[in-house]
Amino acid sequence: MDDVTILATGLGFPEGPVACPDGSVVLTEIRHARCSRVTPDGRVSAFSDCGGGPNGLAIGPDGGFYLCNNGGSRYVGGHSMGMGPHPDYRHGSIQRIDPKTGEATLLYSHVDGQPLSAPNDLVFDTAGGFYFTDLGKRYARHRDHGGLYYAQPDGSSIVTLAYPMLSPNGCGLSPDGRTLYVADTEGARLWAFEVQGPGRLKPKLEFAPHSGRVV
């Protein structure tokens, strides 16, 4: 692959790259509990000391960065993935990061009275709200369920769309905004949900966990 250029090395589990107008890329470093900026010439600088386990990142309609924070994981030598929650783990969260200062502000830590477990990825719709996945947390003998949610960027509203799900990871909308795709990593499935309006999915059938169909 001669057409691939390595711009930066030494990043701690990089995720959620966002291309910025100035040509730089802002990304998350889950293992280092921060967001970093990489310039076109490969220079890396700290952007936000957001803490926890910063995961998915996206620019919102107001120009701010919106972050899925999984709360932090425990890493063991020989394993690239987290092996349970970090000792300081309390819950996951959704944060807004100021694009100028890098200051992180908490938007959501709970839904329906329950703590978020490990928010993973998000995507904005044309109405200005965003869908996001919660991967759940894996423990030695059990795990928290994952789920799919919809929220407003001003912190005013968060609703559950699908719960429980095994391990919802990446998510994205079709070009016409009528289909929401969700990758289920451990289930080795790609789910497609029919979008009937901002934050509204096709109702599920009785006894079904959600209304998604396998692609």
Question: Across the structure, where does each feature detected by a protein language model lie?
Answer:
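Sequence-structural signature of mature extracellular/luminal beta-sheet repeat domains
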Residues: M1-V215
